[in-house]
Amino acid sequence: MKLGQKLGKVGVAAWVVLSALGSAQANQKFCVYDMLGATGDLYNMTKDYAVAMQRNGVTIELKGYTDERVATEDFRTGQCDAVIATAFRIRQFNSVAGSIDTLGSTTIVRNGKIDIAGSYDVVRKLIQTYASPAATKLMTEGNYEVSGLIPLGAAYPIVNDRSINTIEKLAGKRIAAFDHDKAQAVMIQRIGAQPVSADITNFSTKFNNGAVDMIAAPTLAYKPLELAKGIGKNGGITRFPIMILTYQMVINRTKFPDGFGVKSREYWSSQFDRAMQLIKQADAGIPPATWMDLSAENAYKYTLMLRESRIDIAQKGLYDKRGLKVIKKIRCNVNPADPECTTKSEEDWK
């Protein structure tokens, strides 16, 4: 073999090796939705995450978004290697993880009362369960893998009139419904109210301007979205969790080393208490007079109503039955005395 041919082959081999190294060392682009963009709490948590992942050999480049539709679309079209957004948007990439953010699925009723601490314990155990390597199959759909779950807080009913204090009084009222979560409109219609098309960029504006009578939102949104304007002197926030919301991270698995998704989920599981601290601070920041409480009878009745609605919506194909089955098991682990734990509801689907 001639020297020139040998050198040529060596050159090609070197180019292949260097290309592989360059590809491995390229920064991974993360699109991060936060209602406050790059100044928000989630974005700040993600900066710490990036430092932690660098120790695992992955260098992350963050880009903040205030519109999660744009963030998820940039991810879907390959402009980002990973995205963080609410479960409503991430559900298109993994419906099992998206089952966390479903009507009443994580709510615990104990001794006839809503147990909010117990409800968050369900979310904690779910996040721990899905952080396990054994859950990788459930967390993966095609090239997409859920690589983090972060609690955002309970979605509470927020109304512009305190007289709207029962389900019956919501009949005919206008309620914001996200276009990309079809289950919301289904539920609103079930109670005889009127769904008004909205998304995360404008639902608060519609409430503050009086275009809708009710929205559901976590307390973390109260100050940034200036919800006090819509609540005014006559409105309030009902201390009844319609669901507990989560931020979720999903990656394109082809862009990351094997096993990265598990390491990432484990990291975010370790940040649960940090996220809860932010939620508790936001809860404490709501003026005491703004809160409204349901009777124990109605709290239990509405929880059962949400359960019936959740099952119906799952039968319509809008919720993932596998995910709901996992959540049922964890609810019954947290509160085994609940009568539902003696039934096969949400376990044996027909």
Model-predicted regions and their roles:
Residues M1-V12:
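Bacterial N-terminal signal peptides that target proteins for export
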Residues G11-A20:
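Bacterial N-terminal signal peptides
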Residues L21-A26:
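Sec/Tat signal peptide C-region and signal peptidase I cleavage site
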Residues N27-K47:
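Extracytoplasmic "Venus flytrap"
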Residues E61-E73, D179-K182, Q194-N209:
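Short helix-initiation/N-cap motifs at beta->coil->alpha
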Residues F75-F88, R174, Q194, N209-P218:
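Alpha-to-beta junction loops
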Residues R76, F88-H180, A185-R190, L227, ...:
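Contiguous mixed-secondary-structure segments that line small-molecule binding/active-site clefts
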Residues I84-G98, S204-N208, A216-N234:
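A ligand-binding cleft/hinge motif common to bilobed small-molecule-binding domains
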